[in-house]
């Protein structure tokens, strides 16, 4: 993936499409989260999955420049990309590490904070010199990684018996984003507090405690503990409409998020077709009037969902242009009959704002029956990311 700073943005004229990342909007989002954080809690920027499609390398640089002191990722590979940019920033690795003994050379980093579920993993990692910091994962109701009940007690006992040092303890909320009534999340918070107390009974005091992601950070200030993990909303996207409504119900109606990503391309060809012409693979679309068709060099390889075929729009010169026919691997056709000025070279906005019109990740998610997370993370890493403003 190409990471291009604002000084090189004129190069975008040669790309089939490009991503623009707004430094100003990122700063606004960070300021808004910092304004609601409990005093002793630290914001960790989650940059996993190519920074939710925004580009892990440019986002790392922007976050560090904005004062972020901790970064979270899913994998060793992502952590190493960040380590190449900053040699000392603490990096939380949240995904399960397989065969850690085979990665000793890269995992021997005291500023890697590694989340683990199994005591075997902790034994291996703690033998490294220098050893990474270990964060024990608690399953409070997600039913995924971590342990609970008797298994948790056995894990803590085993860790204590072999003298393993812990640096942190963490959990993850299962359904905060999906509901307006948060009984389950409150139950998870209680279970996490019980797990913290249990860890103390084994002598594990002064651990870095963290539970909240974006939605829970907004809604549960009592669960901020020592650290929060901000992912989707770092990029200016709401985790769900339920999250936004829940926040309004708490009386906080002023919290704002600003999407930081725009995805753009250009028209590369114009065709004029008479009525009753077929457009695209499978001849699934037939014109009903003389139609001006614009070709955009973006398709499902680049991350545009094929379910948007004849079911979505792009923006051209501040107006919506309907996608017609099937989205191809690397091309999409638009009806620009109503946009006289549309021509080869005209900028096309796939996600973002043009004049008074906008197309958001949520718009695309609604059309394709998915979530904004998937819309963003499926944008191809091959598309250059350019930092603007």
From Swiss-Prot:
Where substrate binds, per the record, is at 144, 329
Active site, UniProt feature: 48 (proton acceptor), 281 (proton acceptor)
What does the UniProt keyword field contain? Isomerase, Pyridoxal phosphate
Which CDD domains would you find in this protein's record? PLPDE_III_AR
Residue(s) carrying N6-(pyridoxal phosphate)lysine: 48
Q: Which one of the record's GO molecular function terms can you name?
A: alanine racemase activity
Biological process GO annotation list? D-alanine biosynthetic process
The answer, when asked if Isomerase is one of the entry's keywords, is yes
Q: Which domain of life is it from?
A: Bacteria
Question: Which pathway does the record list?
Answer: Amino-acid biosynthesis; D-alanine biosynthesis; D-alanine from L-alanine: step 1/1
Query: Cross-referenced HAMAP family, in alphabetical order?
Result: Ala_racemase
To which protein family does this belong? Belongs to the alanine racemase family.
Could you identify this protein by its name? Answer: Alanine racemase
